[in-house]
């Protein structure tokens, strides 16, 4: 909360805070469900002369806390993710991304971040003709333009776009309408102007993001199952393997993501394998001891043994932050 008060957003902080709140909510929700919907629970309520109304009020209050906290994050993101600031703080990253997107190569970008950083950059350097996030403009939500998640309709309307953005864990501008399961996005400025998070009726609408524990289970729901399916396809489908893999600012704490990356590395080591032409992992740790621990943690997460483990001298790791990836342009050329 201290960072939020200073107008700072760190996704790890956000995820850990929401995870703690979610854990309380899920435990309480499970208990209320037991009391209301199980024979044993109903008998217990009747025998003890108890009511679940107070517990349900606690559940509603927890939802309010989640939405209030998320609203603060949206406000910070909306105030900071602008082209001028991106160009000033991430010029190296933007230059590298622009070089990767030149020509007619197809590029899939997978992000675990909830913000709209990549959308902002891609709309500027690629434009709408070559870029898709699998949403199509359809109708409005309370007067604001609504963009439905619909990969099939996107393909029918626009054909195959060569630059594709996948929000593996959703984004703060994405919502699920509970009445029919419709997933849609709103513009960040509309969310802020309408104070949507603070005014949201959680019986009708809820943020479409993955946080907290059990991500491997949560990823089985739409739209996350679609995004993860495409990610895994690039890692394991012999007819659609990625040739280059750049991993920027990832903690290697999501088992389902690690498993897919591990499979791609195994394919590269096989007898008739297809190794990656380029494999880069970018992090920001400056202390050598922390760097060594990170390398060890990556090898553990990817289940790499003595013969296959990634080493510093392989040139895979860059520890000077995401903006320094621009150096790769010179190396490749």
Question: Each PLM stretch: what is its role?
Answer:
Residues 88-97, 122, 258-265:
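Short, well-ordered amphipathic alpha-helices
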Residues 84-99, 223-234:
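A short, well-structured juxtamembrane/interface segment
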Residues 93-97, 117, 151, 230, ...:
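Short, hydrophobic/aromatic alpha-helical segments in well-folded domains
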Residues 1-4, 123-132, 182-183, 261-263, ...:
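Short secondary-structure boundary/capping segments
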């Amino acid at each position: 909360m201290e960072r939020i008060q200073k107008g700072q957003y760190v996704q790890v902080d956000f995820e850990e805070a929401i995870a703690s709140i979610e854990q309380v909510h899920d435990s309480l929700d499970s208990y209320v469900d037991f009391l209301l919907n199980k024979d044993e629970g109903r008998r217990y309520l009747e025998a003890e002369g108890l009511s679940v109304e107070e517990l349900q009020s606690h559940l509603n209050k927890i939802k309010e806390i989640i939405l209030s906290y998320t609203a603060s994050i949206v406000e910070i993101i909306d105030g900071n993710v602008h082209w001028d600031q991106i160009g000033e703080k991430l010029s190296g990253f933007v230059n590298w991304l622009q070089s990767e997107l030149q020509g007619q190569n197809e590029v899939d970008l997978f992000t675990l971040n909830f913000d709209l950083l990549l959308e902002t950059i891609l709309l500027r350097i690629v434009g709408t003709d070559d870029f898709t996030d699998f949403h199509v403009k359809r109708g409005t939500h309370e007067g604001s333009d609504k963009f439905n998640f619909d990969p099939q309709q996107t393909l029918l309307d626009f054909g195959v776009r060569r630059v594709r953005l996948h929000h593996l864990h959703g984004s703060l501008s994405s919502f699920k309408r509970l009445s029919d399961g419709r997933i849609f996005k709103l513009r960040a400025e509309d969310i802020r102007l309408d104070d949507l998070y603070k005014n949201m009726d959680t019986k009708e609408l809820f943020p479409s993001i993955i946080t907290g524990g059990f991500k491997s289970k949560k990823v089985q729901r739409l739209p996350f199952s679609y995004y993860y399916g495409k990610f895994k396809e690039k890692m394991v489908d012999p007819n659609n393997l990625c040739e280059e893999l750049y991993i920027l600012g990832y903690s290697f704490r999501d088992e389902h993501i690690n498993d897919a990356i591990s499979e791609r590395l195994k394919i590269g080591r096989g007898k008739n394998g297809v190794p990656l032409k380029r494999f880069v992992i970018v992090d920001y740790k400056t202390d050598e001891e922390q760097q060594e621990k990170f390398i060890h943690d990556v090898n553990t997460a990817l289940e790499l043994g003595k013969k296959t483990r990634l080493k510093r001298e392989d040139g895979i790791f860059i520890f000077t932050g995401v903006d320094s990836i621009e150096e790769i342009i010179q190396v490749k050329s």
